[in-house]
Curated annotation (Swiss-Prot):
<dbReference type="GO" id="GO:0000287">
    <property type="term" value="F:magnesium ion binding"/>
</dbReference>
<feature type="binding site" description="via carbamate group">
    <location>
        <position position="191"/>
    </location>
    <ligand>
        <name>Mg(2+)</name>
    </ligand>
</feature>
<dbReference type="GO" id="GO:0019253">
    <property type="term" value="P:reductive pentose-phosphate cycle"/>
</dbReference>
<dbReference type="Pfam" id="PF00016">
    <property type="entry name" value="RuBisCO_large"/>
</dbReference>
<dbReference type="InterPro" id="IPR036422">
    <property type="entry name" value="RuBisCO_lsu_N_sf"/>
</dbReference>
<feature type="active site" description="Proton acceptor">
    <location>
        <position position="287"/>
    </location>
</feature>
<dbReference type="InterPro" id="IPR020871">
    <property type="entry name" value="RuBisCO_lsuII"/>
</dbReference>
<comment type="similarity">
    <text>Belongs to the RuBisCO large chain family. Type II subfamily.</text>
</comment>
<feature type="binding site">
    <location>
        <position position="168"/>
    </location>
    <ligand>
        <name>substrate</name>
    </ligand>
</feature>
<keyword id="KW-0113">Calvin cycle</keyword>
<feature type="binding site" description="in homodimeric partner">
    <location>
        <position position="111"/>
    </location>
    <ligand>
        <name>substrate</name>
    </ligand>
</feature>
<feature type="binding site">
    <location>
        <position position="368"/>
    </location>
    <ligand>
        <name>substrate</name>
    </ligand>
</feature>
<feature type="binding site">
    <location>
        <position position="288"/>
    </location>
    <ligand>
        <name>substrate</name>
    </ligand>
</feature>
<dbReference type="InterPro" id="IPR000685">
    <property type="entry name" value="RuBisCO_lsu_C"/>
</dbReference>
<keyword id="KW-0503">Monooxygenase</keyword>
<feature type="binding site">
    <location>
        <position position="321"/>
    </location>
    <ligand>
        <name>substrate</name>
    </ligand>
</feature>
<dbReference type="InterPro" id="IPR033966">
    <property type="entry name" value="RuBisCO"/>
</dbReference>
């Protein structure tokens, strides 16, 4: 059934829809299956994503038609399809009238992903009007709170050198806490790796007090504050809160130095919102493990990493992993810096839409995945700043001297870039950075050919 007369209006202008402020706009890359017209398939897609089905129903009235999603732009050659969703379509909380991301996702990326006449459809950008921004929580804490704890300026406080305890699984409580202490002697921030929680060989109630003891000893020894991101992910929200409450009790007077890590992609929006609302005084660390199944450029369905990061800010993530923009081991490219710009700025241009955030707090880009001191100067040059959290596991624990030296080498890499210095020349005056060349020789060969002769390592 051709529903384009009802669910498509190509006379609508995008600028008018944005100015009206009553629609969430979604840009897809969509391809119909063979034998289906592009406009017809687009209209069916909009119908299935809002008020319609595959047949006319007798219960539809004029009000219902007033909240139809409308296709307002198509370009079959580029597979571009854009749909305007009226704000009134989306579910609101009974308790406070606020919007919920599960409702948004259910419509814009729900049943339409399994339609018989659609070959594939993937969201590449989404626009939220001011009213929608107001109806989501947004972050309660941001990187400025981390800088304050670390004793830095709360504007442009710079690079936060972090790590992930490695190996990711298999350490018992005492070795785990010892690994944390070794890094904190040089670094700022440690996160649980996403599988770490309450394994039988490393019970949470045994390991966490030891980690806090490591933090206190490192703080006493260095005279500097330290930060820990604790994984509270669980199937059950009450289990999440039990873990979080134990963390706050354990860290006591240092509870402000405790962030909560949530596996938001596998756990779902409810897990992020629970953490955001129940613990507004903690930095909410959004880990996105599993996202690649839909965000990968090779995937034709779902949504992109850009869209994932954007909706994480709406939900209230203080920070989210954004990959390494082609400088680490994960999928990515230099243009992924636009992901960071979208979540850290008050307004930014996306692939399709220019988004204003109307004062919503920023979400920190968290950089991880195969990074070390040698890769960082190029990364910072591409991004244009160093106001990020970087969790370098191998880049710290793989340093030839010690995890603390690995942490120091990361900080020195930032200072090298910030000073505009030549990394080889900078290494001659900074031992830990220089030893990173010997620690990661394959990277050194690829990024800095001839480094052995220049640093005298061949002698």
């Amino acid at each position: 059934m051709d529903q384009s007369a009802r669910y498509a209006d190509l006379s609508l202008k995008e600028e008018d829809l944005i100015a009206g402020g009553k629609h969430i706009l979604v840009a897809y890359k969509m391809k119909p299956k063979a034998g289906h017209g592009y406009l017809e398939a687009s209209a069916h897609f909009a119908a299935e994503s809002s008020t319609g089905t595959n047949v006319e129903v007798s219960t539809t009235d004029d009000f219902t038609k007033g909240v139809d999603a409308l296709v307002y732009y198509i370009d079959e050659a580029t597979e571009d399809m854009r749909i305007a969703y009226p704000m009134d379509l989306f579910d609101r909380n009974v308790t406070d009238g606020r919007m919920m991301l599960v409702s948004v996702l259910t419509l814009i990326i729900g049943n339409n992903q399994g339609m018989g006449d659609i070959e594939h459809a993937k969201i590449h950008d989404i626009y939220f009007p001011e009213r929608a921004i107001q109806l989501f929580d947004g972050p309660s804490k941001d990187i400025s709170d981390m800088w304050r704890i670390l004793g830095r300026p709360i504007e442009n406080g710079g690079y936060i050198a972090g790590t992930i305890i490695k190996p990711k699984l298999g350490l018992r409580p005492e070795p785990f806490a010892a690994a944390a202490y070794q890094f904190w002697l040089g670094g700022d921030f440690i996160k649980n790796d996403e599988p770490q929680g309450n394994q039988v060989f490393c019970p949470l109630k045994k390991v966490l007090p030891l980690v806090y003891d490591s933090m206190k000893r490192a703080q006493d020894e260095t005279g500097q504050a330290k930060l820990f991101s604790m994984n509270i992910t669980a199937d059950d929200h009450y289990e999440m809160m039990a873990r979080a409450d134990f963390g706050l009790e354990t860290f006591g007077p240092d509870a402000d130095k405790l962030a909560f890590l949530v596996d938001g992609f596998v756990g779902g929006p409810g897990m992020i919102t629970t953490a955001r609302r129940q613990y507004p005084n903690q930095y909410l660390h959004y880990h996105r493990a599993g996202h690649g199944m839909i965000t990968s450029p090779s995937a034709k369905r779902g949504y992109t990493a850009f869209v994932l990061a954007k909706i994480s800010r709406l939900q209230g993530a203080s920070g989210i992993h954004v990959g390494t923009m082609g400088y680490g081991k994960m999928e990515g490219e230099g243009d992924d810096r636009n992901i960071a710009y979208m979540i850290e700025r008050d307004e930014a241009q996306g692939p399709v839409y220019f988004q204003k955030w109307y004062g919503m707090k920023p979400t920190t880009p968290i950089i991880s995945g195969g990074m070390n001191a040698l890769r960082l100067p190029g990364f910072f040059e591409n991004l244009g700043h160093g106001n990020v959290i970087n969790t370098a596991g191998g880049g710290s624990y793989g340093h030839i001297d010690s995890p603390a030296a690995g942490a120091i080498s990361l900080k020195q890499a930032y200072e090298c870039w910030k000073a505009g210095a030549d990394p080889i020349e900078f290494a001659k005056e900074h031992k830990e950075f220089a030893r990173a060349f010997e620690s990661f020789p394959k990277d050194a060969d690829a990024i800095f050919p001839g480094w052995r002769e220049k640093l005298g390592v061949h002698k």
